[in-house]
Amino acid sequence: MSKKTSEKRPIIPENFTGLQEGEIPEFATGIKAIKSTLEHIARETGYSKGFSALNKMNQKEGFDCPGCAWPDPENRSSLGEYCENGAKAIAEEATKKKVDTEFFKQHSVNELLGWSDYDLGKSGRITEPMFLAEGATHYQPISWDAAFDYIGTKLKSLPTSDDAIFYTSGRTSNEAAFLYQLFARQFGTNNLPDCSNMCHESSGKALGETIGIGKGTVKLDDFAKTDLVIVMGQNPGTNHPRMLSALRETKKNGGKIITINPLPEVGLMAFKHPQKPMELLGKPTKLTDIFLQVKINGDVALLKALLLYMVCLLYTSDAADE
């Protein structure tokens, strides 16, 4: 049995995790992205298993990418509907590496608390239920029956079913999410928040009050038809690089892009489409036309200024009509 500990637990990693300073690249993706994708697939899954998964990702009759929630076009590319980030995400999901009992014997909870998310993810997939007893320093394996009994006992001990919250990820598969909500409703509650509540609760409420619906109202092909795209509060080149191909369509059709960001992210400056051979060998597509480099939290002041300007325009327009 593991011994109790009074050791102080770190909350975040105390060491830098490979941060490097260097020259800012001239463009994002291109051949480097293809090379990086191949390296991750080879290392984590092997080419056969990896490309078998990639060929099904974001395809009809396939599965959604676990990396982000970027929508899929009606006409899917036979070369693949994923980006470098998506390939890395599926490589980590389908990795050959395993985190077994010996791993948890070797590494205490306090030690693992000091690891970065990256290092934890790269360790592998767990192979059986693990349990951390009160006061213990290490996770220990338990049987599936013991795990179910423990969860059931905890749920039955609640005063009411609404005292339970069944939290999940917005990137959970449809099949798993369906079974999970069925279990929660059978238990007697509809307390089923997920990560989208944390990320989009405020925007959803504001959109509901202004346009009547708490979700986006545009379609993917609207990017190719619009005159202007304002990118604010996000780094698509880092978080959802497939958006860069949509922004590329905006520019190819004469649209303009305004970027508001403290960081001049490379992906929003110029982009080489990895599925366009001539572009890979030639010049990248310049994306951002106007870059507003606000300070951190300066976006609030900027938005207030824009709203004030719009109100002034409205009053000026009304006065002219009179």
Regions found by a protein language model. Give the residues of each.
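N-terminal export/assembly segments and adjacent metallocofactor-ligating motifs
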Residues: 2-313
